[in-house]
Amino acid sequence: MTQEAMSVPLGCDGMRCFSGHEIAGRRSSTCRSGFVFPTPWVLDSYKRGHFFRAVYEANCYAVRANLEAIKADSESPLYVCGGQTASDFYNGILADVCGRQVITQKEREITGLGIAMGAFTGVGLYKDIREAAAEMSFAGKIYEPKHDCQAFYEDWLEKY
């Protein structure tokens, strides 16, 4: 899936995936859930990779919308874990769409790590969950937004 998505340019040649009529907090009166194509007669030119990349990009815009909704500090890095964050490709798009540094966790089984932190705190090995997290969690890879990609996604969002 990722390999196919990587072969498709930013913006998926005009294809978009929407999980609703909003993207990153911007409302569209013409768009509903599903895939949107720039013109119906170009459907034959789209391949599976276009659909895959469109989903990756849509998920990244959803994260951005959540950050904007909670008014997250735009200068602070975004710490991520779980599912899609195992993909370097996804994390790169996320950094570009959100315009901020994305930092993964070294431990991939983050749910188990969280349970261990809670258990160790509960039995008194750590005074609180913050201390457990400071001692037990470590940053993994760091992804920096690429200026040209970030500008592309920002421009697309403005046009939406």
Where are these regions (language model features)?
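Acidic, glycine/GT-rich loop-and beta-edge segments that sit at the periphery of enzyme/chaperone cores
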Residues: G124-Y160
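Acidic/polar loop patches that form or flank catalytic/metal-binding clefts of enzymes
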Residues: M1, I103, K127-E131
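Activation-segment/catalytic-loop signature of the eukaryotic protein kinase fold
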Residues: T2-L113
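Short helix-capping/linker segments at secondary-structure and domain boundaries
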Residues: S28, L67, G122-R130
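Generic structural "secondary-structure junction" signal
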Residues: S19-I23, F37, I115, E131, ...
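Short, well-ordered loop/turn and helix-capping segments at boundaries between secondary-structure elements
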Residues: Y61, R100, G118-Y126
